[in-house]
Regions:
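A short, structured N-terminal alpha-helical element that caps or precedes a catalytic domain
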Residues: 1-134
Length: 134
């Protein structure tokens, strides 16, 4: 679900299709019909994440479980991150467009150590506090 504010900023970034979802084999479920919503995050760009076989296997497997909807989120490129921060748009899942902070679980697939800082950046962009007391 792309709202008007997001639609405006997509006109100002490179490769806007990486932020819209809607691709072939995307799994959409009825929010009211699921018990658990899981945000599967990959701390790199869409192109890198979608070429990761492990992520694709987990996405498919989790969505086969009854009552579970697994959605995807990727680290935005610098131009998109800048626009999202400027317009106060939190990091969102591709399938529903919902902010990551609205999910029951948020998980990350880490392929290498250099991605650790992107995890922190994605949590910050999603307005998810790093400490439970916040």
């Amino acid at each position: 679900m792309i709202d008007a504010k997001l639609e405006r900023i997509l006109l100002r970034v490179q490769k806007p299709a990486r932020y819209t979802g809607g691709e072939y084999n995307e799994i959409i479920k009825d929010k009211a019909a699921v018990d658990v919503r899981f945000a599967m995050c990959f701390p790199d760009t869409y192109e890198i994440g979608m070429s990761n076989l492990g992520l694709r296997i987990l996405y498919g497997s989790m969505n086969q479980a009854e009552g579970v909807w697994c959605e995807r989120a990727f680290a935005p490129w610098g131009d998109m991150e800048e626009e999202m921060r400027k317009e106060h748009i939190p990091l969102y899942a591709l399938e529903s467009g919902d902010s990551l902070k609205n999910f029951d679980f948020v998980g990350f697939s880490l392929g290498y150590e250099m991605a650790y800082t992107n995890v922190l950046n994605m949590l910050d962009l999603a307005h998810i506090p790093l400490h439970s007391d916040q």
